[in-house]
């Protein structure tokens, strides 16, 4: 038992050290060094449902803002699976405000073509054409969305990846527009933040955002705006999930 206790303390101390070192390193890195567009560039975070921005992308959104990029958000549904669409749209706007994104830069697509339903496969071409319209309208330099596994495996998340991959591979994106996808990890890493951080720092990724303690509090506050979704297991998610603190991303 003493050995187990010692190992737990050692892991906690090492993780704290990693956090301090990474916080310093992250603040010294320029967008160019990270392979990102420079300050003043326009980033578009593309999500499927209200609360995706807080549950999965808060580190990216706050990290890009830290790098002085103008962040906008495009949500492909109102999250109306339980007939709460109007409530969830308001919650999304509140959450984005906490994350520093004004209502003028939040776009919610509420169409029958894109229902909040894991059993429905969104049409890739329709998602891609809709996304491309918003990319052009916003003068987007960087698109950020889910990877092929969708973090949680939700079919709506994966549909966004398929659409942006189709645009990228088909050469349809505007010149100079880059795409970042949020890396999915296994369940152990997903819910063991303290153990995951050293692993993440040693793993390959193109861009890594780690939140400071102040920014973590900001991300939690954003998540708390989604009151209709705060079931008991979501509180555990907020406490333990890496995605409330860490985003590792890869370029397409």
Swiss-Prot record:
Record family assignment:
Belongs to the PIGL family.
What are this entry's molecular-function GO terms?
Answer: N-acetylglucosaminylphosphatidylinositol deacetylase activity
Q: Which reaction does it catalyse?
A: a 6-(N-acetyl-alpha-D-glucosaminyl)-1-(1,2-diacyl-sn-glycero-3-phospho)-1D-myo-inositol + H2O = a 6-(alpha-D-glucosaminyl)-1-(1,2-diacyl-sn-glycero-3-phospho)-1D-myo-inositol + acetate
Domain remarks: Retained in the ER by two retention signals, one located in cytoplasmic domain, and a second signal in transmembrane domain that is functional in the presence of membrane proximal residues of the cytoplasmic tail.
EC number(s) per UniProt?
3.5.1.89
Q: Which SUPFAM superfamilies match?
A: LmbE-like (SSF102588)
Q: According to Swiss-Prot or TrEMBL, what is its membrane topology?
A: Single-pass type I membrane protein
Q: What is this protein called?
A: N-acetylglucosaminyl-phosphatidylinositol de-N-acetylase
* Organism for this UniProt entry: Mus musculus
């Amino acid at each position: 038992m003493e050995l187990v206790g010692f190992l737990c303390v050692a892991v906690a101390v090492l993780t704290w050290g990693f956090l301090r070192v990474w916080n310093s390193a992250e603040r010294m890195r320029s967008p160019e060094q990270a392979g990102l567009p420079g300050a003043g560039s326009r980033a578009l975070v593309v999500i499927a449902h209200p609360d995706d921005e807080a549950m999965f992308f808060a580190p990216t959104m706050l990290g890009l803002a830290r790098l002085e990029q103008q962040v906008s958000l495009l949500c492909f549904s109102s999250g109306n699976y339980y007939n709460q669409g109007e409530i969830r749209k308001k919650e999304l706007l509140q959450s984005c405000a906490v994350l520093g994104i004004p209502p003028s830069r939040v776009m919610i697509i509420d169409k029958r073509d894109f229902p909040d339903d894991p059993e429905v496969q969104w049409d890739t071409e329709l998602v891609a054409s809709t996304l491309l319209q918003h990319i052009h309208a916003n003068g987007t330099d960087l698109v950020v969305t889910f990877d092929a596994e969708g973090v949680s495996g939700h079919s709506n998340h994966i549909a966004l990846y398929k659409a942006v991959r189709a645009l990228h591979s088909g050469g349809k994106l505007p010149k100079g527009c880059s795409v970042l996808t949020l890396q999915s990890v296994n369940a152990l890493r997903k819910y063991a933040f303290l153990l995951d951080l050293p692993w993440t720092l040693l793993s390959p990724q193109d861009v890594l955002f780690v939140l400071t303690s102040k920014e973590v509090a900001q991300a939690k506050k954003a998540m708390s705006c989604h009151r209709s979704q705060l079931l008991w297991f979501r509180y555990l998610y907020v406490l333990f999930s890496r995605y409330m603190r860490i985003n590792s991303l890869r370029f397409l």
